[in-house]
Amino acid sequence: MSIFLCFLLLLLLLLVTIIFTRKSQSSKLKLPPGPPKLPIIGNLHYLNGLPHKCLLNLWKIHGPVMQLQLGYVPLVVISSNQAAEEVLKTHDLDCCSRPETIASKTISYNFKDIGFAPYGEEWRALRKLAVIELFSLKKFNSFRYIREEENDLLVKKLSEASEKQSPVNLKKALFTLSASIVCRLAFGQNLHESEFIDEDSMEDLASRSEKIQAKFAFSNFFPGGWILDKITGQSKSLNEIFADLDGFFNQVLDDHLKPGRKVLETPDVVDVMIDMMNKQSQDGSFKLTTDHIKGIISDIFLAGVNTSATTILWAMTELIRNPRVMKKVQDEVRTVLGEKRDRITEQDLNQLNYFKLVIKETFRLHPAAPLLLPREAMAKIKIQGYDIPEKTQIMVNVYAIGRDPDLWENPEEFKPERFVDSSVDYRGLNFELLPFGSGRRICPGMTMGIATVELGLLNLLYFFDWGLPEGRTVKDIDLEEEGAIIIGKKVSLELVPTRRQ
């Protein structure tokens, strides 16, 4: 008998032992309902497709608190605002850790980051650094000129297309906007002038990095699964992508450490962290390292370059499909701001009402991250009367909550008016609308992301009228989704801009 076959038999024996042990323990608990399980793989076969849609279909059968068995990993899926509040508020501290996956461990530099690191002293120190130094209101305001300048450049490029009456690939244009803002404020790199990164290579790197995190890995679900990851090539693919990411981040750091480098009047995120690392005390407190810096800029890169662009694209898709809403929001924007503006600033955002409802409705119907990153219970808790054992993974399906007919009338309809006279907001305090999460794990870059979405969409609506290319109608607009963690529109939206005179 070959060594490999012996290994597989031992692995099978181990899995059977784990399954029977878990069954014995779980028989004494009131666990959430869920679909029937197959031997060994559990419920993995139910996730054949986009996970948020697969889980939406299962929610309709098994309810808002549902348990799946993914290999040997128990996962509880939350699909109601009441259950989400219990997880993210009532039991926030008890379940604010993160499960370990091979991809998250690798891309976060062994959890030297904020997004994927498990809860503990090091994570708390990094989170405090982010809130006070990197994403404070003062820092947010200091980067306002970057957001406004990049939007000015977008308007200029769209105006050139308007003169030719040529269609614009909005997906591409909005990625350039979002990535350019992130590169300037985080890395100090002007995407239009950088010597070592350009728009296409950044888009490719971001896409590959996101997909590898969501790709199936045996080691995430089975003991000894790393052997099969090596055989299937998953480990090799992950290491290759990480090498490219690490190479990019090393170039960013090397550029910042060049002797005689001119530091901008407003230091970027990397400048701030390098300065903190150089000035930190030598006592026993938390020490910031180069890997921490790379872990944090990895978070910013992966979470920042695509989410805002995805949200603006979904908003424009729904507006072009709903001419009534498009006219209403453009009438408000142009009436409030006046007819003769040649530039939009972030101060203009405070004057708009219906426009803000359009943003809310986009977040409800098309959250960029429809599944919040999974949490891990650090103690046994109860959710909606069900027992959730320690070490259980917990995932909130924001997509399902946004389509709950008990919360939203005609939930599939794009109708911003549903938020008139509603106090529901998207900053983590209302559990009906959670595009940025809530609690201790809420997205630390939320304010920056909201500003990028609002200012980008406002420029598109104020300066341009929009139409479909000749021969196409609203019925031709494809709403099919694609993605891994960030879910965007599969087929790009091509529109013809007409600059308002």
UniProtKB/Swiss-Prot annotation:
UniProt keyword annotation of Coiled coil present: no
Q: Which domain of life is it from?
A: Eukaryota
Keywords associated with the record: Heme, Iron, Membrane, Metal-binding, Monooxygenase, Oxidoreductase, Transmembrane, Transmembrane helix
Specify where it is mainly localized: membrane
Gene3D superfamilies in the cross-refs? Cytochrome P450 (1.10.630.10)
Enzyme Commission number: 1.14.-.-
Localization, per the record, is: Membrane
Transmembrane segments in this chain: where? 1-21
Give yes or no: UniProt keyword Iron: yes
**Membrane topology qualifier:** Single-pass membrane protein
| Binding positions for heme per the UniProt entry | C443
Please name the InterPro entries in this protein's record. Cyt_P450, Cyt_P450_CS, Cyt_P450_E_grp-I, Cyt_P450_sf
What GO terms are given for molecular function? heme binding; iron ion binding; monooxygenase activity; oxidoreductase activity, acting on paired donors, with incorporation or reduction of molecular oxygen
PROSITE patterns listed in its UniProt record:
CYTOCHROME_P450 (PS00086)
Q: Cite a GO CC annotation.
A: membrane
Q: Which cofactor does it need?
A: heme
Q: Which family does it belong to?
A: Belongs to the cytochrome P450 family.
Per its record, how is this protein called by name?
Cytochrome P450 71B23
